[in-house]
Amino acid sequence: MADISPPEVYFTQTVPEQYTAALADAPANVAEQPELSAAYEITGPGGGTYALRVAGAQIEALPSEQLANPDMRVILSYDDWRSFAESDATDMLVDYIRRRKVGVVQGLKGTVHLELTRSDGSIWQSTMIFGGQAEPAVTLRMTNEDYGAMLSGELNGQMAFMTGKLKFEGSLPLLMQVGALSS
């Protein structure tokens, strides 16, 4: 488990280090994807708003006011952010780039609420707004373990739904589009 400092350190140092490491082993075409931007709103005491922009082999932390229309806005509580940051998981922006999903992210329009059940029964939550649009919206519910398996390709999203590992409420078309992030 990583020892994480404040969110500012995570977004200005940890995520850029993850990006550099991800590119080191990646095919050249990973860095040739279009520019991708993300804003992170960490709510509650200790939180703040942070912005990242990736262009080619460069990742840049920006003052949040300089990123008016990010491709992806992620909203989560300070406690849920800290839990994620301490898990040694790769930041989702870096993961989407590494897996060549920039075009998929940029094509999404709507809001995805994610509710993951941890092994201790507590719920980890985040909201991702794609393309600056609140609607359509979908809520996904599953275990943290199953979500990780789905993102890694070990668990097919359709199979997760058919076996009851993935439950959703809201827009089926948006759910189908979001499924492309896990393929």
Tell me the role of every PLM-derived stretch.
Residues 1-183:
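Feature captures hydrophobic
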